[in-house]
Curated annotation (Swiss-Prot):
InterPro entries: AB_hydrolase_1, AB_hydrolase_fold, BioH, Carboxylesterase_BioH. Its EC number is 3.1.1.85. One of its GO terms (biological process) is biotin biosynthetic process. It catalyses: 6-carboxyhexanoyl-[ACP] methyl ester + H2O = 6-carboxyhexanoyl-[ACP] + methanol + H(+). GO terms for molecular function: pimelyl-[acyl-carrier protein] methyl ester esterase activity. Belongs to the AB hydrolase superfamily. Carboxylesterase BioH family. Keywords: Biotin biosynthesis, Cytoplasm, Hydrolase, Serine esterase. This is Pimeloyl-[acyl-carrier protein] methyl ester esterase. Substrate binds at residues 22, 82-83, 143-147, 235. The active site is at 82 (nucleophile), 207, 235. It comes from Escherichia coli O9:H4 (strain HS).
Length: 256
């Protein structure tokens, strides 16, 4: 069994596991990890095949969730950003007793656009998969630029994301393709109607990957969940609005 890279920081009485997005690694949380580790016992994770978690091929969402759970605390708040939001959601569905609260950040239960469902056009995701085999570093950089577009700090936010990617060896092409396949095919809209733990959904108003139109649709589908939109953020609100972001998580801690 390959080990997942896992770092624990802080002494808080509540555990908080942070799961990053596609193409990235746990270094993406460095802008908020000091602040959060003063409130939580913080767990920083490189998803299987990403960052320092080497030796994994492309995994299904279920296998990725199970691999992460092997090293996780017995009970924690699980926070997932983008693709990581699907992994955290899968864990909440299959092991609810391990999840004190679920937090998804700039994530969708169904990233791919479907009938009457806003999302990323399937041909865009397929295009990324095609381009990965041609020039995968450039493809990943394009994807990162998409994530910060439109914000006041877009250029520096994109630089921060790029630095995170370049800090560690690039994931294998099949791992990146496997992640895109999850984004293209997974649909957790109906299953997540049944989760009963506190469920907080955070969005960026300017997000080009998770359209804000999904927010009221999910408010209606999941009335037990809460949503919050960062008015001037895009796909990475914890980078553009770190203080506000941490404040919301500390407030959630008081309620679980």
């Amino acid at each position: 069994m390959n080990n997942i890279w896992w770092q624990t920081k802080g002494q808080g009485n509540v555990h908080l596991v942070l799961l990053h997005g596609w193409g990235l690694n746990a270094e993406v949380w460095r802008c908020i990890d000091e602040e959060l580790s003063s409130h939580f016992t913080l767990h920083l994770v490189d998803l299987p095949g990403f960052g320092r978690s080497r030796g994994f091929g492309a995994l299904s969402l279920a296998d990725m969730a199970e691999a992460v759970l092997q090293q996780a605390p017995d009970k924690a708040i699980w926070l997932g950003w983008s693709l990581g939001g699907l992994v955290a959601s899968q864990i909440a569905l299959t092991h609810p007793e391990r999840v004190q609260a679920l937090v998804t950040v700039a994530s969708s239960p169904c990233f791919s656009a479907r009938d009457e469902w806003p999302g990323i056009k399937p041909d865009v995701l397929a295009g990324f998969q095609q381009q990965l085999s041609d020039d995968f570093q450039r493809t990943v950089e394009r994807f990162l630029a998409l994530q910060t577009m439109g914000t006041e700090t877009a250029r520096q936010d994109a630089r921060a994301l790029k630095k995170t990617v370049l800090a560690l060896p690039m994931p294998e092409v099949d791992v990146l393709n496997g992640g895109l396949e999850i984004l293209k095919t997974v649909d957790l809209r109906q299953p997540l109607q049944n989760v009963s733990m506190p469920f907080l959904r955070l969005y960026g108003y300017l997000d080009g990957l998770v359209p804000r139109k999904v927010v009221p649709m999910l408010d209606k589908l999941w009335p037990h969940s809460e949503s919050y939109i960062f008015a001037k953020a895009a796909h990475a609100p914890f980078i553009s609005h770190p203080v506000e972001f941490c404040h919301l998580l500390v407030a959630l801690k008081q309620r679980v």
